[in-house]
């Protein structure tokens, strides 16, 4: 309600904007708006403010109630709330109500574009073998681009943009490089003026929140659930959590599990392999030791009475391997690989004691005369890996020295007669 009657006005500005007389019919208004809107559309290089004014003028004059109030009392009456208020719709929505999208064949248009799919963002996630055995949850803080809430991804205050003059709205530029006589190379690259968007925004019209970038940075914490039995290289996907962009279906954030090496355990599928070294006494007379499992449980490992463990032998324990993924109550096997450590030397008394206990040595079939004819040799200790490396290095050095040697002496020449 007004405290006093509004003043009469003979405002004709909205009619002038559309270029029609005050007695124009609804059909005349439609034709005038369509013609002027296409001409001034930002995607065709038109003035964003002019485009906005055209939409507002048509919105008022096409509504019989608002038009009557405007004709009698002018713009101020609409702003003060007569005729349902002075708020206006998005100028692009009004334009789209006529054409159902872009009348320009989609070239450079910021609306009616076919959406492309954004790229997935892939992160490696380091986990221990213990994590994969027991399962764990990791909280990770990430930064990503999201559509600006102030301009809803348009980049401008008015919602308008202009076709980039540098690339003619294609978002790409072609450069030619001369490689030589009659040879050129043609290369296509994103336009540096519009950053490949095909659009530019007037500096004065840029959104104050995103500065015309259409997106802003957002920090987000994701809870990554690593389930029991997951494998090295397995992917955990968060659909639609990657960087947002206008006219783009948001990609996924993907975490790829990277298992760290374990000092004692090795994993092969659903089985675990454990390395353990026995002394010679343990291998011959029996052993007993405690194995700490990946979940902290203590397992007592012992040999059977009278059992002899040979070097490089394997023993298996059922249901102590890795949990099977998505079937956590089922597990593989644990294999224990035994290495036997021998003493460096024995004194004569120890040798006699062992000979009395152990099976007899094989007897030699050679006679004393045949033994006298044999040549004696001397054995010495060697680290075979270091020995092979030394020989390889020596061979490489000799080859290098040969390459550095100067050409041989003067060639033999035939004496001239």
UniProtKB/Swiss-Prot annotation:
Q: Where are the CXXCXGXG motif repeats?
A: 148-155, 164-171, 191-198, 207-214
Q: Where is the J domain?
A: 11-76
Keyword set includes RNA-binding: no
- InterPro entries (alphabetical): DnaJ, DnaJ_C, DnaJ_domain, DnaJ_domain_CS, DNJA1/2-like, HSP40/DnaJ_pept-bd, HSP_DnaJ_Cys-rich_dom, HSP_DnaJ_Cys-rich_dom_sf
Induction pattern: By heat shock, and in response to NaCl stress.
Task: Enumerate the propeptide ranges.
Answer: 415-417
CR-type zinc finger segments: 135-219
Q: Which UniProt keywords apply?
A: Chaperone, Lipoprotein, Membrane, Metal-binding, Methylation, Prenylation, Repeat, Stress response, Zinc, Zinc-finger
* GO terms of biological process kind: protein folding; response to heat
Q: Which residues carry this modification: Cysteine methyl ester?
A: 414
Compartments reported by the entry: Membrane
Chain residue ranges for the region called Disordered: 384-417
Give the positions of lipid attachment, kind S-farnesyl cysteine. Answer: 414
Function as written in the Swiss-Prot or TrEMBL entry = Plays a continuous role in plant development probably in the structural organization of compartments.
Protein name in UniProt: DnaJ protein homolog ANJ1
